[in-house]
């Protein structure tokens, strides 16, 4: 049986105290470099679903813009709110028609929910790692960790 691929992009963290950086992470050198890295890393992959976290004025981290980060990625892009995460994963898991590639770009406040869904051992797995790609294989709501890509090591 072919397994599906889930790539989770954990957007970067900006030091708010650093007044020399631009207001928005995706416009900073760090954010631009990460976006270009993603464009290159995913250049040969077409995604059946690309989910990026919506901007909610009340809860959003103003330094992150997932949509801009994944600008060059090929596939159908859908915005999601963190309250829709569980429902979104249900939809992804229902599609068992062959192989599919799914990309999820999320910001700070969603990592607890995602950790619970994919069943990672600890919140720390997502909590401290910014500008990373996490690759999972999945089938029938069962997620297996494949690898973590650290952009600074490449």
Predicted features by range, described:
Residues 6, 99-105:
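Residue-level preference for the first positions of well-ordered beta-strands
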């Amino acid at each position: 049986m072919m397994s599906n691929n889930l790539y989770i992009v954990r957007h970067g963290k900006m030091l708010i105290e650093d007044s020399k950086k631009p207001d928005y992470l995706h416009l900073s050198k760090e954010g631009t470099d990460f976006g270009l890295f993603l464009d290159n890393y995913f250049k040969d992959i077409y995604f059946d679903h690309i989910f990026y976290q919506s901007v909610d004025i009340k809860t959003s981290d103003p330094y992150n813009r997932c949509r801009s980060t994944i600008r060059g990625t090929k596939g159908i892009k859908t915005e999601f709110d963190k309250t829709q995460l569980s429902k979104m994963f249900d939809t992804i898991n229902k599609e068992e028609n062959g192989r599919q590639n799914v990309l999820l770009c999320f910001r700070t406040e969603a990592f607890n929910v995602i950790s619970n869904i994919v069943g990672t051992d600890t919140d720390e797995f997502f909590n401290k790692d910014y500008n990373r790609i996490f690759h999972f294989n999945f089938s029938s709501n069962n997620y297996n960790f494949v690898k973590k890509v650290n952009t600074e090591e490449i």
